[in-house]
Design a protein with these regions (language model features):
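Hydrophobic, aromatic-rich transmembrane alpha-helices
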Residues: 13-23, 628-678
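Membrane-interface alpha helices of multi-pass inner-membrane proteins
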Residues: 482, 503-518, 525, 566-574
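Transmembrane-helix motifs of polytopic, lipid-linked glycan transferases
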Residues: 408-440, 483-487
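Interfacial juxtamembrane loops and adjacent helix segments
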Residues: 343-390, 431, 454-465, 595-599, ...
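Specific aromatic-rich, kink-prone transmembrane helix
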Residues: 476-496, 511, 525-528, 716-720
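Transmembrane-helix signature of polytopic, membrane-embedded enzymes
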Residues: 30-42, 427-459, 479, 496-503, ...
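Perimembrane helix-loop-helix junctions
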Residues: 524-568
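Start-transfer (signal-anchor) and selected internal transmembrane alpha helices
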Residues: 2-37, 66-116, 262-330, 447, ...
Length: 787
């Protein structure tokens, strides 16, 4: 009966879809059968609903009928829209027909691929059997069998074995009906068997991990040969205070169909996004003709990114918000620096262990451990006092004012989130300003696609995914660089039009503030100084107005003052702060860190530079059948020596953001420019988007590889590549090459979303913390796992 119902549903859906697609193709016969198609669609819906309320016995196919009815209804609706608008909107009809075809293909994938296990028992002679808990040999561990309710309760970490002898029947599926204890997150089930091919035990033949509130984790398929003889089920719990109550163990129960509209929606969005960039008339229109659409699209993209950042931080928020914002404790940045500044000193108030003062070399981690000397980890130790290497900008702009106002310490995770959100918003604003000034004629799809790739590959995701105190400096620096870039770009210093000195000053201020967040970001200040000097020749000039030499000179002096004073003042603050701590204005103090290595004696090795360059730029992702399907291995390039690698790693940016490959076309772009512009843009892009990011990557040779550093350089690298690619697109008249460029962007957008999501997810939920978030982990894994 199950096969008959399945065939009826499939034939009915096939008929409805044939009519719908025939109608979109302007065939005559579908119009004659239209009402019958509506009736068949209604039947599929009614069959599913009556099964849900137990009026009909659909043999577990209720969801199957409802799914077919929904898919058919969607495609019929699209066919009706196409029939109404086909004479006026040819391009829209093509997009709708493609969407309908994509929905049909995705529905087939749902039915045949993602529900592959539901057909498992259809391929053999299997009989559903409940394995009794009363007639089974139970060994080992702490267990209690309740004969009245016929259920078994297991407690603690000890392994409990249930052995069923002389089963003598094939086993195609295993279902464990069990309730996990209140604090129990998982239970492992392992099955050893004997079958017709092996009279002794085959160990670990079936493996399951039962998860709480995840019913689909309680059944699995079994690929066994012939009849099973002995069937031994082993239960193991991870903690001593865990428990599980086993109510039923059933073999050969049908695995139910499970259809996910969310999964279909994700795939549909990615496919339509790529297709639309290539073929959609709307997305092929120039940005200047669709300003409102581009802004709205950018706003939606930014809002989604902000929600993603919030969700990553929220996943680790397990206390009431009020309690989090009333913290009495903090870390080196949120509390120790705050207390020190309030006390009017630059050294931290933390007491130094006398044993540390007495050590010959306190910077040797192994020596401190061997002598059992207490030391503050990742603090700077100089002249008998503790200091902080980390930037003071977040302290004076957020943590200190908050403590002065409330008497509490601002929470780290929400500080990282706040700076991350500011950075995400201003990254979009910077990108839109970049388009408005240089690429107004670029197609909307290319423009929005570039924004998606840039936001997805910006690196800020790894920062908000793990909110330790290290990430405060990264996130605040990311925000300041994005804000500074926005004001510098909108000052018209790089483009035509009157230069806005106040905006240039704000750009200078925030870029300098970035250095007070993270000293490494000083490289962007150097680039900004060069750019400001390059704009000096245009300073004070107005179109059609000729100024006297003296007035022009005074305006240029004022221009330089606007650009230099904010940066100079903050540089003086940083230099004074360095001198007050380490007796030298140029000493940031990192070599005095009590950390993984003795930086006072570490030596430079060129090979360590190559490790960073390879892993950040070139490391290829690998595919695996385990969700989220892509991962990248960190490699030290077989270079001998101690090189620190933090938890987590990502693929090279050339894979995460495919448009970075546009740098290979830089020569073609430069040939189209006159000599003056060729030199100008070589300096601007080469310095800001290539050289300075490479300097940052090379500078981490001493501190080692950490995934969070990608937020320092990823988006500047990408925006330079996009500038090259967009320029070539606008200046080529070959429509074939333009289409190839749109296809490349159509591929780059889904690729960036998939690869970056996979690496961020793996970083956020590595194996050793997955069970802490078992609900999220299992739900996402279930969503995309086939077997």
């Amino acid at each position: 009966m199950t096969y008959i119902l399945f065939a009826i549903g499939l034939l009915g859906a096939g008929f409805v879809l044939s009519c719908a697609f025939g109608s979109m193709a302007e065939k005559k016969w579908p119009q004659q059968l239209q009402k019958i198609a509506y009736g068949v669609n209604g039947y599929l819906l009614l069959q599913g609903l009556l099964g849900k309320v137990h009026v009909l016995d659909n043999r577990g196919l209720d969801g199957y009928f409802l799914f077919l009815a929904f898919v058919c209804a969607c495609i019929v609706l699209l066919s009706l829209i196409v029939r109404r608008i086909r004479s006026k909107y040819v391009s829209s009809c093509r997009m709708l027909r493609f969407a309908a075809g994509t929905i049909a293909v995705l529905a087939a994938a749902e039915l045949l691929v993602f529900n592959f296990n539901a057909y498992h028992l259809w391929m053999g002679d299997y009989t559903e059997t409940r394995l009794s808990l009363s007639n089974v040999k139970i060994e080992n561990g702490d267990f209690v069998y309740d004969r009245g309710q016929d259920q078994l309760t297991i407690r603690g970490k000890g392994e409990v074995l249930l052995t069923y002898e002389n089963l003598n029947q094939p086993v195609g599926t295993l279902t464990v009906d069990a309730i996990l204890g209140e604090r129990t997150k998982s239970a492992d089930v392992i099955v050893d068997i004997t079958d017709e091919t092996h009279q002794e035990y085959r160990y670990n033949t079936v493996n399951m991990r039962l998860l709480k509130d995840a019913p689909r984790s309680h059944f699995t398929t079994c690929e066994l040969s012939g009849k099973v003889g002995t069937f031994r089920v082993k239960f193991t719990l991870p903690e001593d205070n865990d428990s599980i109550t086993v109510r039923n163990i059933v073999i050969n129960r049908d695995i139910p169909f499970h259809f996910s509209l969310l999964r279909m929606g994700v795939f549909l969005t990615l496919i339509l996004l790529g297709y639309g960039i290539v073929h959609s008339t709307l997305l092929r229109r120039p940005c200047y003709r669709e300003k409102l659409f581009v802004r709205a699209g950018a706003a939606v993209i930014t809002a989604v990114c902000c929600m993603g950042c919030v969700s990553l931080v929220w996943a680790d928020t397990n206390r009431p918000i009020k309690e989090i914002f009333e913290r009495e404790q903090g870390n080196q940045i949120t509390r120790e620096l705050v207390d020190a500044f309030e006390a009017g000193q630059v050294s931290l108030k933390t007491t130094v262990d006398p044993a540390l003062l007495a050590m010959e070399n306190p910077y040797d981690w192994s020596a401190r451990s061997a002598e059992n000397v207490s030391a503050q980890w990742d603090h700077v130790f100089y002249n008998g006092k503790y200091y902080s290497y980390y930037g003071i900008a977040p302290v004076v702009t957020l943590f200190l004012p908050y403590h002065l106002l409330t008497g509490k310490y601002f929470p780290t995770q929400f500080a990282v989130l706040l700076y991350g959100l500011i950075g995400v918003v201003f990254l979009t604003l910077t990108y839109l300003a970049f388009l408005r000034r240089f690429h107004r004629s670029l197609p909307c799809g290319m423009a929005l696609g570039g924004l998606i790739v840039m936001q997805a590959s910006s690196g800020i995701w790894y920062v908000v995914a793990r909110t330790l105190f290290y990430e405060i400096s990264i996130a605040s620096g990311f925000a300041c660089v994005a804000v500074g870039a926005y004001f510098l770009l909108t000052s018209n210093i790089l483009s035509h039009g009157r230069i806005s000195c106040p905006r240039m000053a704000l750009g200078s201020l925030f870029l300098a503030l970035a250095v007070l967040c993270r000293p490494t970001l000083a490289v962007y200040c150097i680039a900004a100084v060069v750019i400001i000097l390059m704009g000096l020749s245009r300073a004070g000039k107005r179109p059609g107005v000729k100024l006297a030499a003296g007035k022009l000179r005074s305006r240029r002096i004022a221009y330089l003052a606007w650009g230099a004073v904010p940066m100079f003042l903050l540089a003086c603050v940083q230099l004074w702060y360095n001198y007050a701590r380490f007796d030298s204005p140029l000493d940031f103090g990192i070599q005095y860190s009590l950390t993984i290595n003795d930086f006072t004696r570490s030596q430079f090795h060129l090979g360590f530079v190559f490790i960073g360059l390879y892993n950040y730029l070139l490391a290829p992702p690998k595919f695996t059948w385990t969700f989220p399907f892509f991962f990248t291995e960190f490699t030290n390039l077989n270079i001998n020596g101690y090189y620190f690698s933090d938890v987590g790693n990502t693929a090279g940016i050339i894979y995460l953001a495919l448009p970075v490959l546009c740098y290979l076309l830089a020569g073609k772009a430069l040939k189209r420019l006159n000599k003056r512009d060729r030199i100008r843009w070589s300096i601007i892009i080469g310095l800001t988007c290539v050289l300075m990011p490479l300097v940052i990557i090379c500078s981490i040779w001493e501190s080692g590889y950490a995934i969070r550093y990608t937020a320092d350089f990823s988006w500047p690298i990408l925006i330079g590549a996009l500038a090259i690619g967009f320029y070539l697109y606008r200046h080529t008249k070959n429509q074939t090459w333009r289409k190839v460029a749109r296809i490349c962007m159509g591929i780059a957008v889904p690729a960036a979303l998939v690869l970056n999501f996979a690496h961020v997810y793996t970083f956020k939920f590595p194996d050793w913390v997955a069970l802490e978030h078992y609900g999220v982990f299992n739900s996402l894994a279930e969503l995309f796992t086939i077997f």
